[in-house]
Curated annotation (Swiss-Prot):
Name by which UniProt lists this protein: Transcription elongation factor GreA
Pfam families, A to Z: GreA_GreB, GreA_GreB_N
NCBIfam families documented for this protein: greA (TIGR01462), PRK00226.1-4 (NF001263)
BP terms from Gene Ontology: DNA-templated transcription elongation; regulation of DNA-templated transcription elongation
Role noted for this protein: Necessary for efficient RNA polymerase transcription elongation past template-encoded arresting sites. The arresting sites in DNA have the property of trapping a certain fraction of elongating RNA polymerases that pass through, resulting in locked ternary complexes. Cleavage of the nascent transcript by cleavage factors such as GreA or GreB allows the resumption of elongation from the new 3'terminus. GreA releases sequences of 2 to 3 nucleotides.
Residues forming coiled coils: 14-76
Length: 158
């Protein structure tokens, strides 16, 4: 029997998924059913672009609901130890990119919560793996997507 994937999330990430699931079921599903009803009222469904679009949206909504429900059945909440001095899920980390002489603060999260545009990096990303378990003052080398080496110093963990 295959083992199920366990999804590591912070409490915040779990709350966001639950909120998204509620929104999909209580708002998006209802809106989509109304759109389907309106499209059906237009007549011939064989060449009805509105109907096709509504059906595609319905499939997307239902797939996301199933995905979230599966995640919620296999979730492991990662509780951050505030006394911990090492990088792990749930921690905020101030990194100094030596070659660029630039400081950037990231929130280290589970894969599902990752959102690089909002400075949330997955612990399983190349950067996340490189800094996991490290402490303030540690210097790590990371390889960029273009295979360029960079030195990163951990300046703060909170």
């Amino acid at each position: 029997m295959a083992s199920k994937k366990v999804y590591e999330l912070t409490q915040s990430g779990l709350d966001q998924l639950k909120d998204e699931l509620t929104h999909l079921k209580d708002v998006k599903r209802v809106e989509n059913l109304e759109a389907l009803k309106e499209a059906r009222e237009q007549g011939d469904l064989s060449e009805n672009a509105d109907y096709d679009a509504a059906r595609n949206e319905q499939a997307r909504i239902e797939a996301r609901i199933l995905e979230i429900e599966s995640i919620l059945k296999n979730v492991k909440i990662i509780r951050t130890n505030d006394d911990s001095t090492t990088v792990n899920i749930g921690k905020k980390v101030l990194l100094h990119f030596v070659e660029k002489n630039k400081d950037v603060e990231y929130h280290v999260v589970g894969t599902i919560e990752a959102d690089p545009k909002n400075f949330k990096i997955s612990i399983e990303s190349p950067l996340g793996r490189a800094i996991k378990g490290k402490e303030v003052g540690d210097l790590v080398q990371i390889k960029s997507a273009t295979n360029k080496q960079s030195n990163v110093e951990i300046k703060a963990i909170s």
